[in-house]
UniProtKB/Swiss-Prot annotation:
The keyword Magnesium applies. Belongs to the PPase family. Its main location: cytoplasm. Residues 36-63, 77-118 are annotated as: Disordered. Pfam families: Pyrophosphatase. Mg(2+) 1 binds at D259, D264, D296. Its cofactor is Mg(2+). It comes from Caenorhabditis elegans. The lineage of its organism: Eukaryota, Metazoa, Ecdysozoa, Nematoda, Chromadorea. This is Inorganic pyrophosphatase 1. Coiled coil: none annotated. Keywords: Cytoplasm, Hydrolase, Magnesium, Metal-binding. Residues 53-63, 77-114 have a biased composition (Polar residues).
Length: 427
């Protein structure tokens, strides 16, 4: 069975339409990818040969302006050739608006369809990367295989994704090289959150081997709210390995300290990546988010295997290829905490994106901070790794202990009842 899903968003007078055709074993929560690479080439495949996605943009003479119109789009049946799928419709919002353009049966059908996309687990070997480093190092290497190993239950606080390399369990933060190809400035990116999902995942920087886990607040797993017209995260979201935004350093251009995390990346390509995937990306620019008084860089990147990668070489190219996406990204980062009762986020540079050259200087700087961090005898974060320069060396015994402290991979925990709810933000 082939499913066809479409999400729609409006920005700057454009209707931005994204289409994803998925095999029944592939979804936004369970994409299985195999990536191989050399110094010059890389290919990506999924468990279904029919899997594809293309961004398309078109002007609309009548932009969507109200909830009824939008929900009509979201409840339209789409025949994919072998089955008809109802797309998800909104079921209320923070500010009262609820769709009335579809029947209750239609809304329930579409809600069930959307929920099925959230609940399929990753495979035990969900993502395998062939890159270039036999020996983990602080620079580019030359041949390695990584696979994602799940523990615990997805959507619960015991969920972990460990990364296994040729030496055994490794830290995706410390052991995967920053560069996939240093000469061409191609970086490795660890995917923490696939596009269109809501579960807020991150590398656990205080745990040995920094597995990916679900963020929590007051003992409850965190999910981002859907800010109209978006669904979950609107890009593949993750981080660059071997980087660190030093909280003891005030960034001169922003006037704020680093946020104590690896540097974040939004990958804007045409495919939904799997959680734990390691993508080869080129960086196009960066946005300087000021999050609760801290500098929180958001790098903009494109998978080098993407169909549009050759067209995207700097930040100005993004607007040409994906018109409206940068504006939507600023809007998303500004507003995503508002439904939780927090104020809107702020930005340095008035929310303007900096170009590729600027972004790469930021990356180089955060890489140097990371090199200093792993040499500290008493670091504030966990720096256990297999890189020779690290003071705290990782061992197979330590890895076995870390994994042994987590439960076996089990059934998914229930999703929150409001995970599909749309929230509307004014102003």
């Amino acid at each position: 069975m082939i499913l066809s899903c479409r999400s729609v968003a409006t920005a700057r007078g454009f209707l931005l339409s994204t289409r994803l055709i998925m095999g029944c074993a592939v979804s936004q929560e369970s994409a299985i990818a195999t990536v191989s690479s050399s110094s010059n080439t890389a290919t990506t495949s999924t468990s279904s040969s029919n899997t594809s996605q293309k961004w398309a943009t078109s002007r609309t003479s009548r932009p969507v302006t109200n909830v009824t119109q939008v929900s009509a789009i979201h409840t339209t049946s789409m025949d994919s050739g072998s089955s008809t799928v109802q797309l998800p419709s909104p079921r209320g919002s923070l500010t009262t608006a609820v769709s009335t353009s579809s029947s209750g049966a239609q809304r329930q059908m579409s809600a069930n369809s959307e929920r099925s996309l959230h609940t399929r687990p990753l495979s035990e070997t969900a993502v395998i990367l062939q890159s270039q480093a036999v020996k983990m190092s602080t620079g580019a290497g030359d041949s390695a295989v990584y696979e994602a190993v799940e523990r615990g239950s997805l959507y619960s606080l015991d969920y972990r994704v460990y990364i296994k390399g040729p030496q055994g369990i490794v830290s995706p933060w410390h052991d995967i090289p920053l560069f996939a190809n240093k000469d061409k400035r191609v970086y490795n990116m660890i995917v923490e959150i696939p596009r269109w999902t809501n579960a807020k995942m991150e590398m656990a920087t205080k745990e040995p081997f920094s597995p990916i886990k679900q963020d929590e607040k007051k003992g409850v797993a965190r999910f981002v709210h859907n800010i109209f017209p978006h669904k979950g995260y609107i890009w593949n979201y993750g981080a660059l390995p071997q980087t660190w935004e030093d909280p003891n350093h005030v960034v001169p251009d922003t006037g704020a300290k680093g946020d104590n995390d690896p540097i974040d990346v939004i990958e804007v390509g045409s495919k939904v990546a799997g959680r734990g995937a390691v993508l080869q990306v080129k960086v196009l620019g960066t946005l300087a988010l000021i999050d609760e008084g801290e500098t929180d860089w958001k790098l903009v990147a494109i998978d080098v295997n993407d169909e549009n990668a050759d067209k995207l070489n700097d930040i100005d190219d993004v607007e040409k290829v994906y018109p409206g996406l940068l504006a939507a990204s600023v809007e998303w980062f500004r507003n995503y905490k508002i439904p939780a009762g927090k104020p809107a986020n702020e930005f340095a540079f008035n929310g303007e994106f900096k170009n590729r050259e600027y972004a790469e200087k930021v990356i180089d700087e955060t890489n140097e901070y990371w090199k200093t961090l792993i040499k500290e005898a008493n670091p504030s974060l966990n720096t256990v790794s297999r890189v020779p320069e690290a003071v705290h060396q990782g061992t197979d015994e330590a890895a076995a202990t870390a994994i042994g402290a987590t439960p076996e991979h089990g059934a998914n925990a229930p999703l929150p009842g409001d995970v599909d709810k749309w929230h509307f933000v004014q102003g």
